[in-house]
Regions:
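Glycine-rich ThDP/TPP pyrophosphate-binding loop and its adjacent helix/strand module
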Residues: 1-133
Length: 134
């Protein structure tokens, strides 16, 4: 937060990307989550905008999987002379049904077979093994 707080004062071309996939390792709680959700729900138009409150310019993109829209957004800010936040909404596991339906399981993992999501090799990394054993 300190970096964001000072970014507006630098007067430099800084592009800050917030990849908002509405996800943490478990259920989301807290003020930052609520603020990002409100921005998503209002297509970035909420008057309660933590980034604007810090003096940062703010842009919202509701479909972070639209490559043309991403290129247009980045092109529009690449030469700007101040710090900007690009709040880009994405879907964790987009395009892989098994990943979209089980986001927590797919939050991190190892190599897998794209056809069915089964792991390649001996198994998942230690973090998966620990999570399942708890």
């Amino acid at each position: 937060m300190e970096g964001l707080n000072n970014a507006a004062m630098l007067g430099s071309n800084m592009i800050i990307i917030v990849n908002d996939n509405d996800q943490s390792i478990a259920e989301n709680h807290g003020g930052l989550y609520k603020g990002l959700k409100e921005l998503r729900d209002t297509n970035g138009e909420s008057p309660d905008n933590i980034f604007k409150a810090m003096g940062l310019e703010y842009y919202y993109l509701g479909d972070g999987h639209d490559v043309s829209a991403l290129i247009k957004l980045f092109t529009s800010v690449k030469d700007i002379d101040r710090a900007v936040v690009l709040h880009i909404h994405t879907i964790k596991g987009k395009g892989l049904k098994y990943a979209e339906e089980n986001k927590e399981y797919w939050h991190a993992g190892g190599p897998f077979h794209i056809e069915d999501g089964s792991p390649k090799g001996p198994g998942w990394p230690v973090n998966e093994t620990v999570r399942e054993s708890v």
